[in-house]
Structure formats: structure tokens, C-alpha cells
Amino acid sequence: MPINAEYLGPGELPQVIPVFPLPGALLLPRGQMPLNIFEPRYLAMVDDALRDGHRLIGMIQPDMSHSRDEARPELFRVGCVGRITQLAESGDGRYILELTGVSRFKVVEEISGLTAYRQCKVDFFPYIDDFTARKGEEAVDREALLEVLTDFLKANNLKVDWEGIESAPNEALVNALAMMSPYGPAEKQAMLEAPDLKTRAEILIAVTEMDLAKKRTSGDPPLQ
């Protein structure tokens, strides 16, 4: 298939993919994630991803709560694979790239010893709906989402491009806000594993409301 062809279903993706464990990183289907790659093993990962033609990297969070080895922590069982859609060389040995999310996956098993970077055998079929853009977005409570976003922005003295937000489809809006949200690995993982867009939006709203309530009670300063 052409290297820029859209993936139409789980069967078009490889069963074994390289994975990049990164705490707090949330990639979602059709979302964009910038990455600054500088470690030798991950530079090799990018080279291999480009060489094999798929240009795929699986983003996944390390599960530190179940890890004894900090150098090679356990992984959460669900991640999201992205395709390298932009790549630039920094001139000092780094890659500056952008991943575009394709589909979530479940880890079947980790494949050990083949490369310096980690690889996993994965299953995309539980997330077959990820291949259908904007699926379920009509069920999202957009009004509630924008209301809590407004409260969050006021509480943290932040500004956004409201014109862009108002024109964004629900899927793009929910996923972008989830990916950019300042919450911890557990909250990010919950949003990743949400069964549908409506539930992801509800989790984001609930977490934000709890964060705002906590700040009002404790008097914490706004985000800088």
C-alpha cells in the first residue's frame, strides 16, 4: 500500500510494533503528538520505523505502580500507535517528529531481546471503531465540555483560540483537550481506555471539575 495511504482496519497493521514508553503521554486516533528523539535506542527505533515502510510507533505509558525495575518498567496494557507524518533533523543528532494517531491497541506480549528499544505483539481488533473518524461524536455533551473548559481557563488565567474551538468537530475537540490536559498518568490512561468518545469527554469533564474544586479549596496558584 502507498506509504501515505489511510489505514482502513486492524488487519492492515503489523502485529509487532516498536513502543515508546513515556509517562503522561497520551496519543489518540487522528491526534498529533510532537516528539523530540535523542536517545540512541529511540533514534534507532525511528530509523527502523522509516526503513520498514510502516512508519509506526506505539505510544504507551510505563506502569510505575507495578514496576520493580525503573530502567525497564512494566507497561500499561493499552497504548495507541501513531504514524510518523512529519520528520526533521535538528543538526545535532536529534529527530524532531510528529506522530498522527491511528488506533489504540492491547499488548499481547512483549518481544524481548531483538532490539535496544522495546517491541510488543499487539492486538488492534478490540478498537476497530478507532478506524472510523468522528464515530460517536454526536453523543458528546459539547456544552458541558465547553463550560468546564471555560472554568479551567479562567481559573488558570489562560487564553485559547475560541474561533478554532468553536469550529472543531467533537472528536477533534475532545481528543485534543484530553491530550493537552495537565493531568497525571492514571487520568491520561483512563481517557485512553474510554470505550467511546462520549465516555472520554465525561472523564475529562469529571477530572477537570475535581481539579478545580481542589484548587478552590486549597488555594493553589494557577498554572504558569
Predicted features along the sequence, with ranges:
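Core structural elements
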Residues: 165-183
